[in-house]
Amino acid sequence: MSHPPGGPVGPRDSSSATVLDYHLSMLHDTARMDAFRRAISATVQPGDVVVDIGSGSGILSFMACEAGARMVYAIEGGPVMELARELAIDNGFADRITFVDGWSTEVDIPEPADVLISETIGNAGFDEGIIAWTVDARERLLRPGALLVPQRLRMWVAPAESFDDHTLVSDWRTTGLPYDYAAAHRRALRTLWFVDLTPGNLLGQPELAADVDLRTAPNEAITSAGTLHVDRDGTMHGLACWFDSLLSDGVTIDNAPPRTESSWFHGFLPLGEPIAVSVGDQLTWELSVSPTGEHWTWQVDRLEG
């Protein structure tokens, strides 16, 4: 199964190519773009001040301008910022977009915003730090009562069978490696992987692992636990993770398997050892995600009896 970033194999400028590939894949995701356009059009009012966090190529900032924003503060800490500046000029938005170079938690804007928009929803929902920077923005960058796009973010987990993806972990223990790579194996076990799953990879129905209202959420870790029910015989290699999000009233988006044309992948939390499961088995799970999305811990156990 493929893992991002993908694309043609061959000599090229890796840094520029990765940036262009990544953002082009999002722009080609029509469901993603249409949903954000509808949400922004319904939320941004003429004359609003908007802050776009993780503005990337500037697409959401452009949508906000078209919705009537007086000024958009586009905050971006990556190299795509310079491309976004050029695109704003080429598309006639440069007079209404102020680009702010840096991470949103480390910069200021000259006036509080009426609307916060952002597309930093990760493959597993919370892996791009949306809780930490949203709380910071609410406290420092927004006026009281400001509106958010997205408003709400949920994460789902399900037992998954994925032989190919589990090799990302198990291959570090194979014979034939020139030295002792046990440390790499331990790190792989603690890694959230991004994979391409289908419903055929799932061994049971999903369970809600997180439901976060970004308008009110505290800057705290997500902690959750539950019980998964196995619907078919197979081998469980890990927990599959995906999200759904309420962007604005009546506008939602998700990356539930299968991906079809989605630019999002899925999250995969591997088990140390695969578990043979049968229909009717129950598995308890625990999960914790830091507000920054950098630290994930999880545990899965068979429920005996």
Regions found by a protein language model. Name each.
Residues 2-53, 57-305:
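Class I SAM-binding transferase module
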